[in-house]
From Swiss-Prot:
Organism of provenance: Chloroflexus aggregans (strain MD-66 / DSM 9485)
Protein name listed in UniProt: Large ribosomal subunit protein uL22
A single GO cellular-component term on record: cytosolic large ribosomal subunit
Keywords: Ribonucleoprotein, Ribosomal protein, RNA-binding, rRNA-binding
Database matches in Gene3D superfamilies: Ribosomal protein L22/L17 (3.90.470.10)
Amino acid sequence: MEAKAVTRYVRISPLKVRLVMDVVRGMPVDRALATLRYMPQKAAREVARTLKSAIANAEHNFDMNRDELYIKTIYADQGPVLKRFMPRARGMANRIRKPTTHITVVVADKSDY
């Protein structure tokens, strides 16, 4: 049995989020949350928030035991890029790219492992 949670349009680069995800991929959920809690990256807070949502979905929608859950799949897709302009000298302008990310976390029972 699997439970899924998706957080969309997070204002962080997908590359930065993937660096955090690589650390917790495949871990039991309680250990992953403890690991994310002590990571200094902003992406760790967003991944932890999505993971907590997936755990809640598993407990309430599928009656799964929290102690049996592990991270089956976790990935970050690129969302739309916000484009802004910054005025520069002599009437020029530079383009500023503000990337967004879609975070997906799938948790499953250890019995499925």
